[in-house]
């Protein structure tokens, strides 16, 4: 995946089916490429955040940040004193980023808060203005659930005007605060549309959907080509059987 032209790749420890040990080997593999490795942590948990950074992640995406206080805690877990409370123990980061990692980590490690609830939207200005926060990352599926309940089917690429309006408001508030606006997408087409709106970071899809989509397309193409090449035997060839 890291060799396919992506700017960054996110290891998903929230909804993904991997744990810390596997994530560490994935970070090791990405080290040979030019991609920026990010980790979406399971929750606002200092241990998960700090261990992900110690393993060599260059940024964390934290789900369900709903208040300024939670955003401040997130930043504090990502930054070393005096900017935060991150414990020093960059077991692998020291090797991947240099023995002076502790001196420049705070300037390089990215900290993204996920906005995906009605509460977070209500506290948007307070969250986006949190010192040390690099950006907000919209989770459109949970955001739609939080704003509208089960009125609409779940999914990523939202077209409902009321949801799109909130997504664009989050984008505007992030840029007003001077931080990055990021959006999770399900398709390249919607990702391109989001870039057109002004988003700084977008996803195209996840590995499971990419694999399933490619497999489905390959099977469909093979069946179509086979059907075109194989024609029924003429009636004379089947006489006597």
Locate the predicted segments by residue.
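Expand to "…catalyze enediolate/carbanion chemistry for C-C bond making/breaking, isomerization
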Residues: 1-241
């Amino acid at each position: 995946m890291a060799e396919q032209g992506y700017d960054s790749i996110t290891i998903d420890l929230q909804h993904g089916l991997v744990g810390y040990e596997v994530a560490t080997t994935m970070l090791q593999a990405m080290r040979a490429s030019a991609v920026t490795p990010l980790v979406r942590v399971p929750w606002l948990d200092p241990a998960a955040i700090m261990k992900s950074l110690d393993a060599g992640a260059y940024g964390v995406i934290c789900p369900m940040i709903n208040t300024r206080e939670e955003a401040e805690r997130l930043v504090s877990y990502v930054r070393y004193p005096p900017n935060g409370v991150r414990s020093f123990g960059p077991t692998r980061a020291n090797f991947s980023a240099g023995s002076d990692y502790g001196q420049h980590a705070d300037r390089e490690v990215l900290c993204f808060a996920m906005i995906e609830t009605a509460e977070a939207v209500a506290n948007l200005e307070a969250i986006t203005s949190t010192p040390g926060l690099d950006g907000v990352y919209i989770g459109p599926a949970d955001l739609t659930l939080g704003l509208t309940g089960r009125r609409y089917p779940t999914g990523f690429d939202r077209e409902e005007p009321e949801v799109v309006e909130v997504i664009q408001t989050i984008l505007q508030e992030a840029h007003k605060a001077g931080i990055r606006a990021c959006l999770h997408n399900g398709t390249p087409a919607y990702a391109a549309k989001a870039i057109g709106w002004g988003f700084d970071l977008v996803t195209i899809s996840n590995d499971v959907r990419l694999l399933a989509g490619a497999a489905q397309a390959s099977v469909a193409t093979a069946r179509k080509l086979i059907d075109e090449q194989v024609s029924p035997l003429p009636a004379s060839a089947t006489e006597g059987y």
